[in-house]
Amino acid sequence: MVFFSAIATNTTKGDFFMRLKESAKEFGSLKSLVAMAMLLALRLALGFVTTIQVTENLKIGFTIFPTTVACMLFGPVAGAVMGGTADILGLMLKPTGPFFPGYTLDSMVAGFIYGYSFYKREKLTAVRVALTLATVTVLVNLCMTTSWICIQYGVKDFSLFFSDSAAAWQSFFAKFRAIFGGRAIKNACLYPVNTIGVYFLLNAVRRVPVLREYMKRGGTRA
């Protein structure tokens, strides 16, 4: 993705794996686990209270805010684990349909991207936040989630990806086009709101003395 490449321009291969290693170490801290649990609970609560189901295939929510805070504090590995856990627990506590692993993968990928982009950064600029959210919007929300909706309510399983049937793929793309427009409009409307909100929220959190000292532990990187 062009978007994510732009925010990772100055990142070396060693730095990438170092971030993964440091994020994984967060699970060894009791304070980190407690904070993760609190942010996970907040994400679930916001998901139950603020989510608006517009249509069967379209809903609006604000879980992005506790999600990005958690990812900034604990990194890509923790972000992916928390994303998957939140999706599964949310479905268990408030079922909205059958379990579908594609949506869990969406939450994990989004958490990984947020965590990698925001974790232990010396600065969180508006450009970094905007490009990160653009990456998640295009890759996860528009491409991946739309594909899962087509599979869940179309071919019913993942066999499509192993099929050479032209008719099956034509049916998939027809459904994809049918629901893509509405999802694109929704994401285009929410993108500036989410970007502005996440930028100011994360930078406000970074100014909290206790959290500022916590994030300095182990150092920051550009």
Regions found by a protein language model. Give the residues of each.
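Loop-helix junctions at membrane interfaces
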Residues: 2-222
